[in-house]
Regions:
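Phosphate/NTP-binding elements of NTP-utilizing enzymes
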Residues: 1-205
C-alpha cells in the first residue's frame, strides 16, 4: 500500500538520493525529481487500475508474490514495452503462486539461451546477513515449514497438504530435480495426484 511504501522505503530513498546535488523530494506523492530530468516514484499496487497510463523505464516490485498479479500483466508490462524497459521482482516465497510461476519462467528462458532474464535465490543460511545464532533461535521458535519459507526461500513449504514438501526441497537443493532432454517421438506417461484443497502434482515418466 501507499502507507507501507512511505513507512518502509521512503526514508531509504531520501537517504541515498539526498546526496545528489539538485535533487528534490515530493513528500505528498513520494516522488524524487533528479536534475537530469529523471524521476523515481514509490507507488502502491493495491489498486491496479490506478496505475494505468504511466510510462516506465524500470520498475521494481517488492514482495511481488503478495501483490495482485494483474499489476504486472495488465499494467506494468505494457507500460515498459514502448520504452524497452526492465523489471526487478523481489519477494518471499508463498507457495506456488504467480511469483513462483515467474521464477519458473526465468529458469526456462535461461535454459533456452535467453540473456534477458536473471534470477538469484538468496537463502539466509548462505548470505550470512543474519547471524547463525539468530537463525538457530528462529528455527527453534518456528515450524519447519515457516522457517524454510521465510529464511530458506522454500516455495514448497507453504503449500498446505504438501506431505512430501521437505523431501522435494531436499531433492531440489541436491540437484535431483532438474530439466532433462526428451524425445517427443516417444510416449510420455503421467501419474496424477489430484489436489482438491491443495496443489495438484503430476509425475512424468
Amino acid at each position: 500500500t501507499f502507507t507501507q511504501a512511505k513507512r518502509i522505503a521512503w526514508d531509504y530513498v531520501k537517504y541515498y538520493a539526498g546526496v545528489i546535488p539538485g535533487v528534490s523530494f515530493n513528500e505528498t506523492e513520494l516522488r524524487v525529481d533528479f536534475p537530469n530530468g529523471g524521476r523515481l516514484m514509490l507507488l502502491s499496487a493495491e489498486n491496479p487500475d490506478s496505475l494505468r497510463g504511466i510510462y516506465l523505464d524500470m520498475c521494481a516490485f517488492d514482495e511481488f508474490g503478495m501483490q495482485n498479479p494483474r499489476v504486472w500483466g495488465e499494467v506494468v508490462r505494457p507500460a515498459l514495452s514502448d520504452r524497452e524497459g526492465a523489471a526487478i521482482f523481489l519477494g518471499t516465497p508463498a507457495g506456488h503462486n504467480h511469483f513462483y510461476d515467474l521464477l519458473e519462467t526465468a529458469k526456462s528462458q535461461i535454459d533456452e539461451g535467453s540473456d534477458q532474464w536473471y534470477y538469484k535465490i538468496v537463502k539466509a543460511s548462505e548470505s550470512k546477513l543474519v547471524k547463525d545464532e539468530e537463525l538457530k533461535a528462529a528455527r527453534a521458535q518456528m515450524t519447519p515449514e515457516q522457517y524454510e519459507q521465510e529464511y530458506e526461500c522454500s516455495f514448497t513449504a507453504a503449500i498446505i497438504g504438501a506431505y512430501y514438501g521437505k523431501l522435494i526441497s531436499d531433492a531440489e537443493d541436491n540437484g535431483r530435480v532438474t530439466r532433462v532432454p526428451y524425445d517427443p517421438m516417444y510416449p510420455v506417461h503421467t501419474a496424477w495426484d489430484l489436489g482438491i484443497n491443495d496443489s495438484t502434482a503430476i509425475w512424468f515418466a
